[in-house]
Amino acid sequence: MKRKLVTSALPYVNNFPHLGNLIQVLSADVFARFCRLKEYETLYICGTDEYGTATETKALEEKKSPEELCSFYHAIHAEIYNWFNIAFDYFGRTSTPQQTEITQGIFNDLDKNGYITEHTIEQLYCPSCKRFLADRYVLGTCPSCSYDGARGDQCEHCGKLLDPTDLKEPRCSSCGAAPEVRSTTHLYINLPKIVPEYEKWMPKTAEEGRWSNNALQMSKSWLRDGLQERAITRDLKWGIPVPKKGFEDKVFYVWFDAPIGYISITKCWADLAGKDWKAWWLDQNDVELFQFIGKDNIPFHTVIFPCSLIGSGKNWTKLFHMSGTEYLNYENGKFSKSKGVGVFGNDAKESGIPADMWRFYIFYNRPEKNDTQFTWKDFQERVNSELIGNLCNLVNRTATFIHRYYDGKIPQVDGAKSGREDIKSMVKSLREAASASFKKITELSDWAELRDSFHEAFALSSVANKAFQDGEPWKRRETDPEYAEALMSELCYLIKDILILIHPYMPQYADQAAGFFGQKIWSGNIFDGKAPQFNKPEGSFLSWKNLGEREGLKTVENPVIIFKTLDNKVIDAYRERYSGSQKDRKKSEKGCSACKDSGSSKSDAAASSAKPEVKLSPAELFSKKIALKTAKIISVERHPDADKLYIEKLDDGSGEERTILSGLVPFLKEDEILGKTVIIADNLKPRKMRGIESKGMLLAASWYDEEEKEHVELLQAPWAAPGTPVILEGDADISDPEAVKAFYAQKPAAIDADTFFAAPILIEDYIPKIEGKKLLVAGKEMKLEKVKTGEAG
């Protein structure tokens, strides 16, 4: 039996984790708990990522040393994860001697094997802080709009993309001193040289390990576009020293050493537990590494980290299964750790809403194949209808009925052995449904398809609820007691099974509900920050092997209400309380009074007198910054160096031919694209793809057929001339073409991808919209043929 090594993305220590960050840690927790219930040998490792520029800068802002800052936020993260009932085997840190030892060892192996190169580059240097500055830590006056607070990578006032040297009167963001241009030499990992060995490993592993589709496609895209040598050193003080002559004053770049943290944190665990860390990481053929990562970090774990391990020449345990999620967005916007926007772990902890209620919604809404939205309205509806109305209702009504009408004693009957066909048929139907669910949930869980697995458990709960309702035990206990007893006995065992199935997701609730029936379930200890937690407590516990068993239940305690429904008043108060940024909330003197109704908060809901920072809604962002227009595709050809890229030439109404590259080869043939009048992202920053510059992006939406095969449909406006602006309903007088052009002309010349995707275009009943407003082309709405709901991009 394969051993399971489980890791989640190491959270960075510059803020509180928000719900989007928590998805990875929680997902790995659910998978590890499932593995323990299956009695696989399991090790779940995580910890805080502590080195790098962001830590140094944050420490300066907070007037702390980097060590003090990391210790402060490490304790906060550990406390939040503890509150969320996350059962790490060990939660460590990357600023340890073990991390230094292993990182330097891997580097030395890479260097010895000829995979390290040197390159000299020019960077801005602050003579006052005595350090080189990353682009975003240079401020100055924008050469385009004269905004004085423009960053060295982009002016957020007008959207213009910049280099630090473009700024007028540039200054260091930390001390205000004028920077100098200096040369510096860095070490690089020669990824192109490692690619041949990587390409022997990746396809087979991705197939055997069933990598999530986004992980597979992103990895192939990186290879298709060509890997470049990547710098692995930085001119910083806070980091792991480089063990190479001439580079003693440099440290390793955080992206290089951070994934090695999985190994070093395992060593920290092993050192305390008296174990051998190499038994999990070196020369082991019976270990499967499951990694849980957000999509922005996928290539570092599917390409860069494996290349580093392969290049070392040693037989490291490498990625087996990659569970990469899409984004969880917040109320039609984006969670932002740096800006403090959204619901954060400390918010959840202080809200009064139980941890398992948060866990329920995160997994019911887990963004496995597409981005999903956290909205307070949906949170309310899912909690009230599924968690409380379905699962809790089943548990409470069954336990209450047994306690009230059978004196708390579960009928000791087996309906499958009844002499009556109607009773045997009822029991057979329930057991067949349960057996099918067990099989499906096990298969899904084995491959970390957690949302579908979770939904399946709730579907089984619905089956049990229907059996209760259809069986009418409140009538039959007097008119047909034999049937009522068989039904209630079967429901008690079915509830026992469902509680085992959901225990990885909601361990606290499942423990408490199982206690109503005199049972215990164990899937992991909560890490206390002091010692490794790998021992199962003494006593008898239910596990996966007990699914389907129909013996052992005797009595039922009088159940208590564990969760309260969330009413509109409560939800409106939460939405108000968690709008804006964390900084705005701290300025508020009063909190959320309606939260008291759910036992969620002791504060009042009055609005803050402090003026909040202006935050653009997706619709406002689109109207102010995002430029879409029509273009006619006049030629299509395959990219000579990329299997999945088309090179499209377009007439965009400007008088000059425009080139856009798209990854549509797997989805559309050339003749399905040629001649179409499509929608393009007009002011998206140009990007080189395999040596050819792509000026913009074609907009399309995807849909899946019954076999889960992905298809793509282009957004089109065949009635419009090339160059026709796309505007949002209500933005300009659509009857006046000049007014539309004038409105369109106010948008910035270039925006980055993050800005573009911060205004999601959702397909609602075949029509592209932003926040419910239609996108119009020459006064007409667009309508897709096959994509009824989804997102365009």
Swiss-Prot record:
Its EC number is 6.1.1.10. Residues 591-610 have a biased composition (Low complexity). Residues 581-590 have a biased composition (Basic and acidic residues). InterPro entries: aa-tRNA-synth_I_CS, Anticodon_Met, Met-tRNA_ligase_1, Met-tRNA_synth, Methionyl/Leucyl_tRNA_Synth, MetRS_core, MetRS_Zn, NA-bd_OB-fold. One of its GO terms (biological process) is methionyl-tRNA aminoacylation. Keywords: Aminoacyl-tRNA synthetase, ATP-binding, Cytoplasm, Ligase, Metal-binding, Nucleotide-binding, Protein biosynthesis, RNA-binding, tRNA-binding, Zinc. ATP binds at K337. A motif ('HIGH' region) lies at residues 11-21. It holds the Pfam family tRNA_bind. The keyword Metal-binding applies. It catalyses: tRNA(Met) + L-methionine + ATP = L-methionyl-tRNA(Met) + AMP + diphosphate. It is found in: Cytoplasm. Binds 1 zinc ion per subunit. Zn(2+) binds at C142, C145, C155, C158. GO terms for molecular function: ATP binding; metal ion binding; methionine-tRNA ligase activity; tRNA binding. NCBIfam families: metG (TIGR00398), PRK00133.1 (NF001100). Homodimer. This is Methionine--tRNA ligase. The gene is metG.
